[in-house]
């Protein structure tokens, strides 16, 4: 068994469960910070040490960070009722963990933050975004992730920190892009707004990038985009999904006014029932952008990152998992 000890937040979710599995395959000793109410279905068969609490619980954090060589901070909100909720969890939660590290494990080898392309915003030119581009987030979620990165910068003279920025992530267990798989499986390909181009990363490639970053000996702060090779339009991405599903979906153009009405209904629902929704004004801002394209050249050069799967291969694996688990 490896002597490397890993502390992981958000281990029960889509991304976190895959990180947890891969850490155990590497024979790392894994400790997971989980809320008392966390649904642990995805990690129920894994062997790990559980610390019960959350990223606002100082006592739990003190127990969680002790004796860890690496902390991978993956927990966070991707949907929230308002910006303050995003900030409280995504930004302040990051600060809480870093404070706990300074107090209880100041000689930690590395803190790895799983951030997002949303922290930087869409592409403003024909060239893909790289790590030198200034952050221009356009959503509350993006601003909260950008703030988390800024907090990391503030602590980087005391703690070695790596920031991983994925674009849109897909793969087994993912529940948002999954809805697109589900609709295409019904023979429909919705076309919303103008055509846009974007980067994606399969969960397998993302986890590969995270694992190799564990051994990167940067002294201060490094940031890396991790992505699949190439970029796609929604039509191209949809075609790959349809091919794996053996479907020839009918393309249905959804007028902007219908989308705006749907967003309005969702916003009212969210306010009345105090629940976060996926399709809201923030998501509409993202959908209106024409390019969400990044490059992982820095990760390739400095980390030796190479995708382990093509996007097409990863879509095939994802479709198989959705079918095997009754999602399709």
Predicted regions: what is each one?
Residues 4-26:
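N-terminal Rossmann NAD(P)H-binding glycine-rich loop of SDR-like oxidoreductase domains
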Residues 96-140, 162:
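Conserved Rossmann-fold NAD(P)-dependent oxidoreductase catalytic core, especially the SDR/UDP-sugar
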Residues 162-179:
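Flexible, glycine-rich beta-alpha linker
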Residues 9, 192-196, 224-231, 242-245, ...:
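Glycine-rich Rossmann NAD(P)(H)-binding loop
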Residues 147, 174-179, 192-214, 221-225:
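Substrate-positioning beta->alpha
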Residues 39, 44, 48-92, 120-121:
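NAD(P)H-binding glycine-rich loop region in Rossmannoid oxidoreductase-like domains
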Residues 216-279, 296, 312, 316-319, ...:
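Mid/C-terminal beta-alpha module of Rossmann-like enzyme folds, strongest
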Residues 136-162:
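Active-site Tyr-X1-5-Lys
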């Amino acid at each position: 068994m490896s002597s490397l000890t890993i502390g992981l937040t958000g281990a029960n979710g889509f991304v976190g469960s895959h990180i947890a599995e891969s850490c155990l395959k590497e024979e790392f000793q894994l400790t997971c910070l989980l809320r008392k109410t966390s649904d642990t279905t995805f990690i129920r068969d894994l062997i790990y040490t559980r610390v019960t609490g959350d990223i606002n619980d100082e006592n739990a954090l003190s127990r969680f960070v002790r004796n860890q060589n690496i902390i991978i901070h993956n927990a966070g909100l991707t949907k929230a009722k308002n910006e303050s909720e995003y900030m409280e969890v995504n930004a302040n939660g990051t600060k809480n963990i870093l404070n706990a590290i300074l107090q209880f494990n100041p000689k930690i080898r590395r803190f790895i933050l799983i951030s997002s392309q949303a922290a930087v915003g869409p592409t403003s030119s024909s060239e893909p975004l790289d790590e030198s581009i200034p952050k221009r987030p356009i959503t509350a979620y993006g601003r909260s992730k950008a703030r988390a990165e800024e907090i990391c910068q503030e602590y980087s003279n005391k703690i070695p920190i790596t920031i991983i920025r994925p674009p849109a992530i897909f793969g087994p267990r993912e529940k948002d892009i999954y809805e697109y798989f589900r609709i295409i499986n019904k023979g429909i390909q919705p076309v919303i707004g103008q055509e846009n181009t974007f980067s994606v990363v399969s969960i397998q490639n993302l986890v590969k990038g995270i694992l190799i970053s564990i051994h990167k000996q940067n002294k201060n702060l490094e940031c890396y985009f991790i992505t699949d090779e190439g970029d796609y339009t929604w039509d191209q991405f949809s075609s790959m999904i349809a091919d794996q599903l053996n479907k020839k979906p009918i393309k249905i153009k959804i007028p902007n006014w219908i989308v705006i009405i749907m967003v309005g209904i969702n916003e009212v629902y969210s306010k009345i029932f105090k629940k976060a929704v996926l399709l809201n004004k923030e998501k509409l801002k993202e959908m209106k952008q024409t390019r969400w394209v990044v490059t992982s050249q820095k990760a390739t050069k400095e980390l030796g990152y190479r995708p382990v799967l093509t996007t097409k291969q990863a879509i095939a694996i994802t479709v198989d998992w959705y079918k095997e688990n009754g999602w399709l």
